């Protein structure tokens, strides 16, 4: 007996990240190889032609799991009964644009989308915000959807997590899949703090294996934090395929579980680790039965506290910068 189709809404559907994302969702990479999906694609009126072109390509792949596609410029149509919502579209920073202008331009988008999710999405909708500034955009959407559980709203730190894994594997000579218990704390921005104090590879402590504080401080942390900028510098375009891959990883693990492995998600704070409630902050979690659970009680040393507070300060500044645009 085939499972009933799940509805997956994707915003910014004509964009580069979506182009790397949609075919993988239709192939079963997001929700499992036995789970049919209906894609509900949202983009601006002027992008509808481009979205139709992408849908022609989706049709031409003849994916067995793709049960249907909706194309729209109306968030209430895109989010109708959505089980998963990937909020990829956001206002990019244009030349000469101040950060506060970027925040308010995105606040406009994410208040509307949060309100639409509140009105029409499944009450169990799993929301992942990919569009930057992702943590604050997720916060805005969450605050604009008072009837949905706060825990439904998450921001993507998985790209930073995967970038950190890759750097640690290269430095230690261990296979990337063998590395466990990595954490990335804070904002999806260069202030984030990738933390491998607890990490192991094949049962060995990575901290002992690498044993290089200078590398950690002067190479590892900045490399992970500035990787996006390095890719733009090298490629002339921002990272799209790796971002799409991280979005798939994030939602797949949230839905299907991590088998006890730590992953990083930006989630609403419950006040632990000195992070004020409701701030969407990257923390290590494990997922099972469709729920994430933060790893609790980790020791925070002085260096980590300083790094965690630094990225928190940026998030608080962003939150305060959009406070006047939010109703609650």
From Swiss-Prot:
Write out the coiled-coil annotation as residue ranges: none
Q: Which GO terms describe its molecular function?
A: L-malate dehydrogenase (NAD+) activity
Q: What class of enzyme is it?
A: oxidoreductase
Source domain of life is Bacteria
Which is a Pfam family this sequence falls into? Ldh_1_C
Query: Member of which family?
Result: Belongs to the LDH/MDH superfamily. MDH type 2 family.
What this protein is called in its record is Malate dehydrogenase
């Amino acid at each position: 007996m085939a499972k009933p189709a799940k509805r997956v809404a994707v915003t910014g559907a004509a964009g580069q990240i979506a182009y790397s994302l949609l075919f993988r969702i239709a192939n079963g990479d997001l929700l499992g190889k036995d789970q049919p999906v209906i894609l509900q694609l949202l983009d601006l009126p002027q992008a509808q032609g481009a979205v139709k072109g992408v849908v022609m390509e989706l049709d031409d792949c003849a994916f067995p799991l793709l049960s249907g596609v909706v194309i729209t410029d109306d968030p209430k149509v895109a989010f109708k009964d959505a089980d998963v919502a990937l909020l990829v579209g956001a206002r990019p920073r244009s030349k000469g644009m101040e950060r506060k202008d970027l925040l308010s331009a995105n606040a406009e988008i994410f208040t509307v989308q949060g309100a639409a999710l509140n009105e029409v999405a499944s009450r169990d909708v799993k929301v992942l915000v990919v569009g930057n500034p992702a943590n604050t955009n997720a916060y805005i959407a969450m605050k604009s959807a008072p009837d949905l559980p706060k825990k439904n709203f998450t921001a993507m730190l998985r790209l930073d997590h995967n970038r950190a894994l890759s750097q640690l594997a290269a430095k230690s000579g261990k296979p990337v899949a063998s590395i466990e218990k990595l954490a990335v704390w804070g904002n999806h921005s260069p202030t984030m703090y990738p933390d491998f104090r607890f990490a192991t590879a094949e049962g060995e402590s990575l901290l002992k294996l690498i044993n290089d504080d200078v590398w950690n401080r002067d190479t590892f942390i900045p490399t992970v934090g500035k990787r996006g900028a390095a890719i733009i510098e090298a490629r002339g375009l921002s990272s799209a395929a790796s971002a799409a891959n991280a979005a798939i990883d994030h939602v797949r693990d949230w839905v299907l579980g991590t088998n006890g492995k730590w992953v990083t998600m930006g989630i609403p704070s419950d006040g632990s680790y000195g992070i004020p409630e409701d701030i969407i902050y990257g923390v290590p979690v494990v997922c099972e039965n469709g729920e994430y659970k933060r790893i609790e009680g980790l020791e925070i040393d002085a260096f980590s506290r300083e790094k965690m507070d630094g990225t928190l300060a940026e998030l608080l500044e962003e939150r305060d910068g959009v406070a006047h645009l939010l109703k609650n």
